[in-house]
Amino acid sequence: MGTTTFSGPVVSNNGFTSTSIAFDDLPTASDSTGRIIFVNDALKASETAGNGTGNLVFSDGSNWIRVDTGANAGK
């Protein structure tokens, strides 16, 4: 995967596209610090275990964190 470094704000008039992956296929959080991924079966705040419909998560180097609540990601 290629990387690009920016020195200022990043602006898109057409949105951004994120990688999509299943929760069980996430790489280890410790190997992915700073990565942002859409997990297609991760839980949202209103969903129950096993019924996740997707959430954006990021790695803090220890855990995958849900962007909607700041809690550890789950499915």
Give, region by region, the residue ranges found by the protein language model.
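Residue-level marker of intrinsically disordered, low-complexity segments enriched
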Residues: M1, G8-P9, T19, I65
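Short beta-strand segments and strand-loop junctions that repeat across beta-rich extracellular domains
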Residues: G52-G61
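Repetitive beta-strand solenoid architecture
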Residues: T5-F6, S12, S32, D60
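Extracellular/surface-exposed low-complexity repeats and stalk/linker segments enriched in Gly/Pro
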Residues: V11-A49, A71-K75
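Residue-level signal for well-ordered, solvent-exposed loop/turn and beta-edge residues enriched
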Residues: R35, N63-I65
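Beta-propeller fold detector
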Residues: R66-G70
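Structural motif
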Residues: M1-G2, T48
